[in-house]
Amino acid sequence: MARTFFVGGNFKLNGTKKSIKEIVDRLNTASLPENVEVVICPPATYLDYTVSLVSKKQVTVGGQNTYTKASGAYTGENSVDQLKDVGAKWVILGHSERRTYFHEDDKIVAEKTKFALDQGLGVILCIGETLEEKKAGVTLKVVERQLDAVIAEVKDWTNVVIAYEPVWAIGTGLAATAEDAQDIHHSIRSYLAEKLGKDTAEKTRILYGGSANGANAGTFKDKADVDGFLVGGASLKPEFVDIINSRN
């Protein structure tokens, strides 16, 4: 089945009002495919501002994190309601940097995912293995474990987009080949079919998220199970438009 091409831009802890305006202006004026969904995720302090700038119909805004409570004494956290209140439609959850630096385990990621979905946000769910896990040959075991935690909590995957991000490729300049990514994505889709049914598996978009850039994005275009990209550093640069247009 045809799944809508999806490109997420994770700005991480980068950007100023000036640089974010430049990024959004580029997207607003660029010639983008009609059948693409683009989600840009600036730091939380700039969410409201970013939403106010976007005019391109293919582009929406998402958060980089949220919490499992609607409100309360949780200093420094962002709530789903607050993200929605400023116009965010999506949130990235389970990113390897959250798992590594902030010790978010599979259970926490699953709880956050369920809460965000229940409150009406779409979720870009990140999964992936470290270099050590890759060398040990346990990539599939790792991503299946990460998926199992969410499958236990979430039954309706309509608003979930999976981002496979090999941790060894993030921000390193290394990238899985398109063939390698296709193999892993196909295995992920097969696992979803086993656990959630073929229909859900066929409808769920699976993105590649390891150092995707303007130079390599085109090599993925004919890979049946690669439905787009979650882009890090390149989302801050003009080549982000090239990635969005890489299916043309």
From Swiss-Prot:
The keyword Cell division belongs to this UniProt entry's keyword annotation: no
Gene Ontology terms describing biological process: canonical glycolysis; gluconeogenesis; glyceraldehyde-3-phosphate biosynthetic process; glycerol catabolic process
Disulfide bond positions: none
Coiled-coil regions listed in the entry: none
GO molecular function (one): triose-phosphate isomerase activity
Enzyme class, spelled out: isomerase
Reaction catalysis annotation: D-glyceraldehyde 3-phosphate = dihydroxyacetone phosphate
Binding site for substrate: N10, K12
Keyword set, alphabetical order: Gluconeogenesis, Glycolysis, Isomerase
UniProt EC number: 5.3.1.1
Xref: Gene3D superfamilies: Aldolase class I
Domain of life: Eukaryota
InterPro entries linked to this entry: Aldolase_TIM, TIM_sf, TrioseP_Isoase_bac/euk, Triosephosphate_isomerase, Triosephosphate_isomerase_AS
GO cellular-component term (any): cytosol
Active-site residues annotated for this sequence: H95, E165
Pathway(s) it belongs to: Carbohydrate biosynthesis; gluconeogenesis; Carbohydrate degradation; glycolysis; D-glyceraldehyde 3-phosphate from glycerone phosphate: step 1/1
Family matches, as NCBIfam families: tim (TIGR00419)
Subunit (UniProt): Homodimer.
The family this protein is said to belong to: Belongs to the triosephosphate isomerase family.
Name recorded for this polypeptide: Triosephosphate isomerase
Source organism per UniProt: Candida glabrata (strain ATCC 2001 / BCRC 20586 / JCM 3761 / NBRC 0622 / NRRL Y-65 / CBS 138)
